[in-house]
Amino acid sequence: MAAPRRGRGSSTVLSSVPLQMLFYLSGTYYALYFLATLLMITYKSQVFSYPHRYLVLDLALLFLMGILEAVRLYLGTRGNLTEAERPLAASLALTAGTALLSAHFLLWQALVLWADWALSATLLALHGLEAVLQVVAIAAFTR
């Protein structure tokens, strides 16, 4: 994946194109995930007897996840494009946190619809792929 740069030095480009593509795909998918999950929480609170304290908890966790996801994608993109290990490592740590929150929406909600399951499982798969590529990119940057 490293291509020689033209110009003054003989340095190589170490940024991961597949990782950058996954960051872009994950950002787009998360925007849809956020809206769909917000609508499903609203639907569950109106149609089913969804406990109020769980409704507040799920909404708070969804908005926390949105903030963490935005920071994660920013740090990951910045670390990948500048070939810096620290922002990419911070993004990797935030990936673990957002994966845990995604697992909450997949397994531990008071009421999990099949659409919740499908959306959260897809998001977890994206996070898993990104984590693997982030580890590979960090290893390439530290050589």
UniProtKB/Swiss-Prot annotation:
Organism of origin is Homo sapiens
Kindly list the residue ranges recorded as spanning the membrane: 21-41, 55-75, 99-119, 121-141
Its Gene Ontology cellular component terms are: ciliary transition zone; membrane
The protein's name in its UniProt record:
Transmembrane protein 80
Q: Which GO terms describe its biological process?
A: non-motile cilium assembly
Q: What is its main location?
A: membrane
Bilayer topology reads: Multi-pass membrane protein
Where found in the cell?
Membrane; Cell projection, Cilium
UniProt keyword terms in alphabetical order: Cell projection, Membrane, Transmembrane, Transmembrane helix
**Has keyword Protein biosynthesis?**
no
Q: Which positions are tagged coiled coil?
A: none
